[in-house]
Amino acid sequence: MMTYNKKYIDSVEYDLIETRKRMWMMERKKNEELLKKYQQAMSDLEDYKNLYMRQRSEMENYQRYIEKTINNIKANANADLIKTMLPVLDSLDAGILHDEKLKPIRSQLIKILSNYGLKEIESRGKKFDPYLNEVVGIVKGDDDIVVEEVQKGYILNNEVLRTSKVIVSKGGNNEQDNRN
């Protein structure tokens, strides 16, 4: 049998231990690098996720903006068309005073226009509202009550298209102004 020198064995053990230490250090370094790469990848993933969410939110906001813009364009186009129809309604109102047979035509036209958001302002017998009514005459009577509509007013999609021209009563005053 062969006998080994104690120094030689110690030297081999030392080399083995040192080799293991180096391997362990290399693995540790490699693991640290992998951990850093993993952490960077997770950070990048989070950044991309946030970017995606922002882009998605911006796209949804843009779609809502486009829809709102299209609806406004439609509403304005309808408003322009309906405004041009108001003199026709005024003519029908004047014609009804002479011929009741025009009432169904006016009703039909109002029904069609109401499908596009037009509403008549009902003022007669109600308290004067400066947002809905324009005073064209004042008569003696209860304060601020609309006694007569000289010209109908209209609301389109909750916005005043044309104010009603009205005669309003004022308490204790004689007829002061009556412009027709």
From Swiss-Prot:
Localization, UniProt: Cytoplasm
What's one GO BP annotation on this UniProt entry?
Answer: protein folding
Give the record's keywords alphabetically: Chaperone, Cytoplasm, Stress response
A GO cellular component annotated for this chain's UniProt record is:
cytoplasm
Q: InterPro entries attached here?
A: GrpE, GrpE_coiled_coil, GrpE_head
Superkingdom of this protein's organism: Archaea
Q: Where is the signal peptide?
A: none
* Keyword Amino-acid biosynthesis listed: no
Any one Gene Ontology MF annotation carried by this entry is: unfolded protein binding
Pfam families per the record?
Answer: GrpE (PF01025)
Entries under HAMAP family matching the protein: GrpE
* Family statement: Belongs to the GrpE family.
Q: What does this protein do?
A: Participates actively in the response to hyperosmotic and heat shock by preventing the aggregation of stress-denatured proteins, in association with DnaK and GrpE. It is the nucleotide exchange factor for DnaK and may function as a thermosensor. Unfolded proteins bind initially to DnaJ; upon interaction with the DnaJ-bound protein, DnaK hydrolyzes its bound ATP, resulting in the formation of a stable complex. GrpE releases ADP from DnaK; ATP binding to DnaK triggers the release of the substrate protein, thus completing the reaction cycle.
Q: How does it assemble?
A: Homodimer.
Output this protein's name: Protein GrpE
Which species does this protein come from?
A: Picrophilus torridus (strain ATCC 700027 / DSM 9790 / JCM 10055 / NBRC 100828 / KAW 2/3)
Q: What is the lineage of its organism?
A: Archaea, Methanobacteriati, Thermoplasmatota, Thermoplasmata, Thermoplasmatales
